Amino acid sequence: MHFIQPLQAFLQTKHIVEFSSIQQAVFKVWPRQNVVGIAETGSGKTFAYLLPALNQIDVTLNKPQAVVFVPTKELKWQILTILNDIKASFTGLKVSENFNSNAHLIVSLIGKDIILHETIKYVVFDEVDMFLEDSSQAEWINCVQLFQKHKPHFGFFSATLFNEQLQQIRKQVAPLTVVNQKKRAWKHSLVKHFLLNLNGQEPFAGLLALLNYHHNEQVLVFCSNAKSLKQLTSLLAHNQLSFKSLHGQLTPNERKHIFTSAANNTVRVLVVSDLLARGIDLPHFSVVISWDLPLVDSFYIHRSGRVARFNSWGNSYVFDLPHNQHKLTKFAHKGILFNSVHLERDGTLKFPQLKQSKQKPAVSSELKTAIKRIKAGYKKVKPNYKKRQKQQIAELFAKRKQRRSWKNF
């Protein structure tokens, strides 16, 4: 895809010179066609739909031209932050969360404040499977049908979209091109899953052991409901542990402040409800602990995906408790392999199946192709060719590391 000059300038500023598989595939069809984009968490779905839509914006037309619907305030703030950064290179671009503005691109929740503009030609639903849940499906259908009056192109994106949900989308929007870059819906190649055997001790003792073991890392602790979260935060406060909590009962300003602090690497332990399991990028976090398992099975994949963002490894822990066995059995049948961890009496952790060798960085298909291209350039053996070849490959990895925080989107 050829991007207009402002977007080229932005990509150059962020040192983005290659695109992920989902981005490359979506660029071929969106926004000329209705598209469903499915790819694992942290693969770059946001840029997959955002860059092509921005590429079509006419800044001389002071009317809304594209809208992105998201299911949570946190995801809305995250996308608006990205757009505000893009605006530095995109003179004249206006973005907003309000439909009563003349912004070119609107990022919004689904609600009563939606205003239909005939100039809106591109409509995206991010984390679309959340809109397809029973409690919000009717509102989503009404929203889609409202915008269909002016025949825009639709984009639907998620990390977990099953056949039944895909059929629900097809009933509302046709024709539809499906771009599926996730062949194994329940597995993420960069997440290591661990099952913590408490050996008769309390779950909180296990949590303390995990926090101690990962004392140099940032940790997300997920709770499935408000009662569970309140109980856990009380225990943490009673034990004088430093943490922040983020949940739906906070005011919007409180939620935004805590979310921004976590995104800016100033929070080590963040206790959250499942509202943060979807689409949120917290690049500094590398550990997820499920204090209890989510009510919706697929949310476990989204929880663990918070710490495996575009070629970075993540660890996800679950407690081996009787009331978790039913869901754990279902996860196992879906192909999730849990490594066994034991809580010792002295509060330490034993990893009998964990190799202590340093994990090798994951290599994307694009990077593999670039490495092959370098090696192919040395068909004739010349003095010091191995040294030069090794240096070129090292520079590739260095560039990837420099780009990683932005390629997460």
Curated annotation (Swiss-Prot):
Keywords: ATP-binding, Helicase, Hydrolase, Nucleotide-binding, RNA-binding. Residues 26-179 form the Helicase ATP-binding domain. Signal peptide: none annotated. It is an enzyme of class 3 (hydrolase). Its EC number is 3.6.4.13. InterPro entries: DEAD/DEAH_box_helicase_dom (IPR011545), Helicase_ATP-bd (IPR014001), Helicase_C-like (IPR001650), P-loop_NTPase (IPR027417). It catalyses: ATP + H2O = ADP + phosphate + H(+). ATP binds at residues 39-46. A motif (DEVD box) lies at residues 126-129. Residues 190-349 form the Helicase C-terminal domain. The keyword Ribonucleoprotein does not apply. GO terms for molecular function: ATP binding; ATP hydrolysis activity; RNA binding; RNA helicase activity. Belongs to the DEAD box helicase family. This is Probable ATP-dependent RNA helicase MG308 homolog.
